[in-house]
């Protein structure tokens, strides 16, 4: 069975976007390519044991095992050597991507304190959207009693859109709650 948002995209969102953007070919309609979750752990340079519970949290949120990111260069000011683990990331594609986006929109974002919508300025100019989350507790997969350290993450939604306006229209159709600008 396909993910709920994937079916919604095929049946409702794609035809609506095609009409809205004035495209003739359905394959030209922008779609979500992948979602990348990145958790930077600068403190892991001093104590590598901090990395394990946060990697486990990221695995629970994403539903697949994250890869640890390592430092590309040594930086003396940050006490970082080349090859030291400094974070974790996961790339979601296909059904798991749609399921994660569904959980993020319907469960995760509404649990953020003082949530008024996500920023409309976080597009990169090439149709991709990046969103910062301050703590991992907004996801129901995380057991609050087992969390030792609150850690935020970056969530990047990569689309096939050529510009920000078509990407914004795509995400709005998916139900991403953008902040109302007064």
Curated annotation (Swiss-Prot):
Annotated Gene Ontology cellular component terms: ribonucleoprotein complex; ribosome
Single GO BP term: translation
This protein's UniProt keywords: Ribonucleoprotein, Ribosomal protein, RNA-binding, rRNA-binding, tRNA-binding
Alphabetized PROSITE patterns for the sequence: RIBOSOMAL_L5 (PS00358)
Gene Ontology MF annotations: rRNA binding; structural constituent of ribosome; tRNA binding
Superkingdom as given in the UniProt entry: Bacteria
Subunit structure as annotated in this protein's UniProt entry: Part of the 50S ribosomal subunit; part of the 5S rRNA/L5/L18/L25 subcomplex. Contacts the 5S rRNA and the P site tRNA. Forms a bridge to the 30S subunit in the 70S ribosome.
Record NCBIfam families: PRK00010.1 (NF000585)
Family stated for the protein in its record: Belongs to the universal ribosomal protein uL5 family.
Functional summary from the UniProt entry: This is one of the proteins that bind and probably mediate the attachment of the 5S RNA into the large ribosomal subunit, where it forms part of the central protuberance. In the 70S ribosome it contacts protein S13 of the 30S subunit (bridge B1b), connecting the 2 subunits; this bridge is implicated in subunit movement. Contacts the P site tRNA; the 5S rRNA and some of its associated proteins might help stabilize positioning of ribosome-bound tRNAs.
Name of this chain's protein: Large ribosomal subunit protein uL5
Species of the source: Acidobacterium capsulatum (strain ATCC 51196 / DSM 11244 / BCRC 80197 / JCM 7670 / NBRC 15755 / NCIMB 13165 / 161)
Gene designation per UniProt: rplE
């Amino acid at each position: 069975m396909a993910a709920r948002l994937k079916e919604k995209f095929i049946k409702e969102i794609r035809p609506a976007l095609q009409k809205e953007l004035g495209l003739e070919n359905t394959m030209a309609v922008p779609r979500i390519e992948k979602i990348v979750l990145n958790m930077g752990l600068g403190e892991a340079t001093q104590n590598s044991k901090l990395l394990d519970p946060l990697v486990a949290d990221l695995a629970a949120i994403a539903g697949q095992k994250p890869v640890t990111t390592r430092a590309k260069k040594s930086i003396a000011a940050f006490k970082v050597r080349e090859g030291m683990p400094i974070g974790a990331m996961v790339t979601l594609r296909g059904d798991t991507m749609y399921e994660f986006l569904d959980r993020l929109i319907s469960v995760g974002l509404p649990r953020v304190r003082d949530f008024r919508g996500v920023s409309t300025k976080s597009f990169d100019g090439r149709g991709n959207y990046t969103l910062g989350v301050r703590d991992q507790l907004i996801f129901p997969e995380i057991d609050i009693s087992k969390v030792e350290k609150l850690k935020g993450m970056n969530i990047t939604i990569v689309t096939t859109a050529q510009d920000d306006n078509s990407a914004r229209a795509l995400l709005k159709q998916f139900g991403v709650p953008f902040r109302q600008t007064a």
